[in-house]
C-alpha cells in the first residue's frame, strides 16, 4: 500500500524529463493502495472512491484539492453524489511521472479502507 511516496513532494513539470516507462510504473504501483489501476496505454493511474453521502464526497474532494494545490499537481476528477473517480497523469508529458504516484500516495493516506 502506501509507502514513503506520501512523504515526498512533486517536482516542477518544467524540465521533468520523460514519462515513466512500463517497468518503472510496474515498480511504483505496488507502493499504492491495490485499488489504483493503470490504463492499458500506461498513461493514467486511476481509482474509484465511494462514500455514504454528498457531504463526505465533497469533503474528500476538498482534501484532494488541498493536496493538489500544495503539490502543484492536479488530477482529473469525476464527482457524483456518493463517488469520486480520480485520474492522474502528467499532462505536460502525456504520461505518468513520479508526481502522479506521489499524489496518489498522499490521497491514499486520507482514508482508511
From Swiss-Prot:
InterPro entries per the UniProt record, alphabetical: PCD_sf (IPR036428), Pterin_deHydtase (IPR001533)
GO biological process assignments: tetrahydrobiopterin biosynthetic process
Keyword Lyase among record annotations: yes
Keyword set, alphabetical order: Lyase
Catalyzed reactions: (4aS,6R)-4a-hydroxy-L-erythro-5,6,7,8-tetrahydrobiopterin = (6R)-L-erythro-6,7-dihydrobiopterin + H2O
EC number, UniProt record: 4.2.1.96
Disulfide bonds: none
Broad enzyme group: lyase
MF terms in GO: 4-alpha-hydroxytetrahydrobiopterin dehydratase activity
Domain of life from the UniProt record: Bacteria
Short name of any one Pfam family annotated for the protein: Pterin_4a
SUPFAM superfamilies xref list: PCD-like (SSF55248)
Keyword Lyase on entry: yes
UniProt record similarity statement: Belongs to the pterin-4-alpha-carbinolamine dehydratase family.
UniProt name for this protein: Putative pterin-4-alpha-carbinolamine dehydratase
Organism of origin: Legionella pneumophila (strain Lens)
Amino acid at each position: 500500500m502506501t509507502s514513503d511516496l506520501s512523504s515526498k513532494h512533486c517536482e516542477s513539470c518544467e524540465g521533468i524529463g520523460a514519462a515513466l516507462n512500463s517497468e518503472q510504473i510496474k515498480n511504483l504501483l505496488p507502493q499504492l493502495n491495490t485499488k489504483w489501476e493503470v490504463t492499458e496505454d500506461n498513461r493514467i493511474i486511476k481509482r474509484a472512491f465511494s462514500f455514504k453521502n454528498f457531504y463526505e464526497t465533497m469533503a474528500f474532494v476538498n482534501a484532494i484539492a488541498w493536496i493538489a494545490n500544495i503539490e502543484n499537481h492536479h488530477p482529473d476528477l469525476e464527482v457524483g453524489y456518493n463517488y469520486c473517480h480520480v485520474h492522474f497523469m502528467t499532462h505536460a508529458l502525456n504520461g505518468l511521472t513520479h508526481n502522479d504516484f506521489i499524489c496518489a500516495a498522499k490521497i491514499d493516506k486520507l482514508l482508511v479502507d
